């Protein structure tokens, strides 16, 4: 993947004439679908086929299908999946049960995605939420302790990959301390590098063999005054070299 590679979205449930021409010319690395692009299984499959036909190759097509609040493929056409907090609760009762439940849930998600031509899922979430942080992560997380997050996230990755879907770990190097929603404002995380090394960074290092990672759109002031989405220095502080889509 080139440093200049891009993943593009589109305006609605089917390709417009102008989008088709633009995508053919731009030849993006992949595409991402949002709720505005999704109506029913037959429509999504036609759309993913059209996108690949437009660029002339079997490109990756991404979606955010975590379960809970973040689920682009929804009822009544698709199953409703639990949030990350459910696996956290199950893990507290029995580690094996929490891990197995996460695997099975994401294995089913993989089947749903592959059936409509989606081949990459922006999951699992590896962030460690803090009590004073914005609730944008909250129940999407697998826990507040790195050990359980790592265990559950490994199961999630296995479920997706065994179903033929590429996982995208997120939000590297940790969004759990952000005090604002990064979709609305730019969070600035001001704790020391040493603190991050002992906490937020741990899950991302443990899963650094993931095929892809999505960056957090935040400033980590111990490394740079620039948002990590634009800062190679901040990204390399984790020594993470896999492709990294920007959030």
Q: Positions of the model-derived regions?
A:
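Boundary/entry segment of secreted carbohydrate-active catalytic domains
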Residues: 1-14
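Short, acidic/polar
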Residues: 13-22, 106-109
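Acidic, His- and aromatic-enriched active-site or binding-groove loops in soluble protein domains
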Residues: 140-159, 187-201
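Charged helix-capping and loop-helix junction motifs
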Residues: 227-236
């Amino acid at each position: 993947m080139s440093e200049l590679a891009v993943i593009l979205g589109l305006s609605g449930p089917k390709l417009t004439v102008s989008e088709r021409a633009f995508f053919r010319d731009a030849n993006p690395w992949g595409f991402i679908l949002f709720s505005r692009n999704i109506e029913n299984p037959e429509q999504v499959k036609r759309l993913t086929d059209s996108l690949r036909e437009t660029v002339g190759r079997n490109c990756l097509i991404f979606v955010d299908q975590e379960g809970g609040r973040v689920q682009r493929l929804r009822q009544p056409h698709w199953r409703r999946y639990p949030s990350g907090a459910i696996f956290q609760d199950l893990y507290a009762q029995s580690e094996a049960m929490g891990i197995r439940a996460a695997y099975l849930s994401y294995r089913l998600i993989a089947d749903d995605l592959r059936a409509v031509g989606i081949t990459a899922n922006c999951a699992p979430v590896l962030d460690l939420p803090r009590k004073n942080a914005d609730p944008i992560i909250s129940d999407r997380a697998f826990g507040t302790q790195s050990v359980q997050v790592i265990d559950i996230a490994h199961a999630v990755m296995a479920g997706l990959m065994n179903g033929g879907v590429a996982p995208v770990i997120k939000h590297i190097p940790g969004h759990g301390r952000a005090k604002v929603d990064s979709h609305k404002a730019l969070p600035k995380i001001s704790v020391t590098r040493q603190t991050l090394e002992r906490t937020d960074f741990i899950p991302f290092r443990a899963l650094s063999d993931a095929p892809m990672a999505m960056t957090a759109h935040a400033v980590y002031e111990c490394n740079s005054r620039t948002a990590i989405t634009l800062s190679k220095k901040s990204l390399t502080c984790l020594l993470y070299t896999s492709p990294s889509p920007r959030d």
